[in-house]
Amino acid sequence: MLDIKFVRDNPDAVKENIKKKFQDAKLPLVDEVIEKDAKYRECLKEVESLKAARNKLSKANGPLFGQLKKCTDEAQKAQLQAQIDANNAAVKADADKMAELEAEEAKLADRIQEIMYTIPQMIDPSVPIGPDDTYNVEAQRFGEPVVPDFPIPYHTEIMESFDGIDMDAAGRVAGNGFYYLLGNIARLHEAVLAYARDFMIDKGFTYVIPPFMMHGNVVQGVMSFPEMDALMYKIEGEDLYLIGTSEHTMIGRFIDQTLDEATLPLTLTSYSPCFRKEKGAHGIEERGIYRIHQFEKQEMIVVCRPEESADWYEKLWKNSVELFRSMEIPVRQLNCCSGDLADLKVKSCDIEAWSPRQQKYFEVCSCSNLGDAQARRLHIRVKGKDGKTYLAHTLNNTCVAPPRMLIAFLENHLQADGSVTIPKVLQPYMGGLEVMVPTHKKG
């Protein structure tokens, strides 16, 4: 969300940014919001002017009442009363006019906010320009992708060989997009989360378990309306939504707060279940646990000064790379293009893991710099040493989301005999287990 003053002062730049995001339908909104803002500010001036006039008239009535009380001349009393009545009539007229203006002011304010929530954040100059994710740009690779000399089964087949997943039962219980994890697969799921938690704590992040629901005003503060509609589950009859990612309640923690600059940066890592309506397009790669309604995730967020956010962006995505490489999974960084950025994002990149089965990379983490967009919506301010306040910057990144992580892990550590090796960093979280041996082999 942009500052309205910035839009007023830089309409051409705002329009150019909209074009870069291939959202030309929003271009008329820039002129509309500038026009509405001018009317809004004029309303404010008129209301203040009327308030001043009303106060002046009300103040003038004081001495007139005093004179009227002491006056004995009937003609003069009538004249004083007439003046008081005229002042009262003017005060009432001003009050009626103020009520009209304040109603118009509220209407304008609502429309201005609606538009400002729709106009996208200014993207970073380094963001590649393109209409959709096919224009995302590979930046660099970490680790050598390996294509084994034996066939890699689909991830659910690997899990089934360990008696580690039951999607049929989950379908009967909750429908499509849910799963039961069992035995060593469930244990591996928890091991990855526990390792990621400790990995981030060792990086100096504070571990947090946040609320798994949030109010509507927090939802609107952390994400765009299209995202909200496509993602969020609402609790019927309640002003509560199930979180789609813990970053939302983590950032929401600071709503309407003024933070002491000396406490920044705030570096937090959180565990949560996540709930999402989206299931994705049907097809072979949509089977299994790649895109689901419920999953668990370890997240990282940063609240910092504006001048620090670019550096923190680099640190956050590199944390993900280091984490995946420590588990011996090849990854690459993919810079998201302008058309693939959500409206609140200044810059974003995906970390993608190598899939030996598909012989291509797939998304496992997403790192974003949101600038002051969330802070502006949620009123998260910072008080500097000079006593002045400014908006914080917020960033987030997936540390690890085990459903997709498990796919990458199982494919990259699968052996020809169907066993799965456990890298050294995970062995303490698996009771010292070095190799997972399948319960049975399909076929």
PLM feature segments, named:
Residues 27, 141-443:
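TRNA-recognition modules of translation machinery and tRNA-sensing kinases, especially anticodon-binding
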Residues 1-145, 160, 164:
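N-terminal alpha-helical targeting/anchoring segments
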